[in-house]
């Protein structure tokens, strides 16, 4: 098994991070996405997973969710409990070049499995 990492996902994930993740998935024939972090990491992973199965710019999928026809399987390990992203089909992505922040949703972006160790949330 080969593992590829997309690190440095900031709060309010940016479309640039999504594009980088999609490129990583396509160039390396990645077949699943594991998000380890909080809601921003999981939101980014969801759109990366959908974008990896789409031929255009992943921003298209943010502003036009009906174009999401499939996504790579998504799994999450939640380290910060706050947004509910680990159990839903929604994601919020920002494009700072346009000063826009959009929500998108698709059943294809719902994580297949999520793990939560409550000890990670004691300090929240």
Outline where the language-model segments fall.
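N-terminal small/polar loop signature for handling phosphorylated ligands or for N-terminal nucleophile
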Residues: 1-56, 65-66
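A glycine/threonine-rich phosphate-anchoring loop and its flanking beta-alpha core
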Residues: 53-124
């Amino acid at each position: 098994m080969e593992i590829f990492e997309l690190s440095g996902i900031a709060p309010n994930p940016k479309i640039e991070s999504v594009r980088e993740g999609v490129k990583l998935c396509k160039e390396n024939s990645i077949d699943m996405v594991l998000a380890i972090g909080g809601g921003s990491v999981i939101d980014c992973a969801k759109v990366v997973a959908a974008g990896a199965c789409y031929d255009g710019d992943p921003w298209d999928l943010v502003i036009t969710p009906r174009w999401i026809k499939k996504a790579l399987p998504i799994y999450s390990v939640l380290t910060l409990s706050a947004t509910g992203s680990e159990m839903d089909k929604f994601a919020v992505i920002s494009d700072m070049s346009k000063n826009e922040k959009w929500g998108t949703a698709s059943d294809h972006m719902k994580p297949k499995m999520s793990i939560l160790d409550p000890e990670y949330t004691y300090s929240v």
